[in-house]
Amino acid sequence: SKMSFKKMQSIYGVEETKKFFKNSVEGSNHTKDIIKEYNIECDVTGDSSYVVAHHKNKFEQIKEQAEVYKSEFGIETKIYSKEEFDEIGHGGTEQYGAFSYKPAFAINPLKFVNGIAKYALSKKLKIFEHTKVDKIDKENGSYILRTKEGSIRSKKIVVATNGFYQEGLIPQMDGRVLPVISNIIVTRKLNEDELNTHNFKTFSPIANTKNLLYYYRKLPDNRILFGTRGDLT
């Protein structure tokens, strides 16, 4: 389920909640900067994200959410009625208006990662694939990463394992990192008649107001991607 900003504030306080949204904005901008600087082709689409009211009684909720995003966190937002979003986004039986927020966009994550790797290799950096780090030691102001194939010494390390961190490598991280699992399914390529059935126009990422996270977007080749939490059966 998704935690509302009010609940976040009640649990973590106003300042920590602001930091959360600030990190989201900075992360989006930083990703776009990397794509531009490294000249990565990763199917960037959309110029915002949308939150869609899936029921008519949710429209006031998203209007309030959009106002809080703008007033409390400085995030650019815009409200769309059901009819307005039907013109620029999509229609359907679970579309009762929406709001957009920026900065946001969609990418192909595999192409993004491959682009970073390609750039690193072009700068003569070494990438060791399928090499498990068994232990990290700190020695004389630097780190030693020990593997079965050998060791690497570095002044700085970045642990970028997503949620699949190996317990015991860095004691400060033990018990603090959890995987957030998502199930994703993609349709075949849809023709114009099929897309026009719900007037699906936007390529921006979309989520709706259901408590259980549900997101979707149109891909550049006119397939539709659907995603939701993956730890449920």
PLM features: residue spans?
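Dinucleotide-binding Rossmann-like beta1-alpha1 core, especially the glycine-rich loop
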Residues: 1-82
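Active-site substrate-recognition segment that forms the wall
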Residues: 29-30, 37-45, 133-135, 140-193, ...
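Short, solvent-exposed beta-strand edge segments and adjacent coil->beta transition regions
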Residues: 47-49, 96-98, 182
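Helical element adjacent to the flavin cofactor pocket in flavoenzyme catalytic cores
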Residues: 60-71, 92-156
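Flexible hinge/switch segments at interdomain interfaces of large molecular machines
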Residues: 84-93
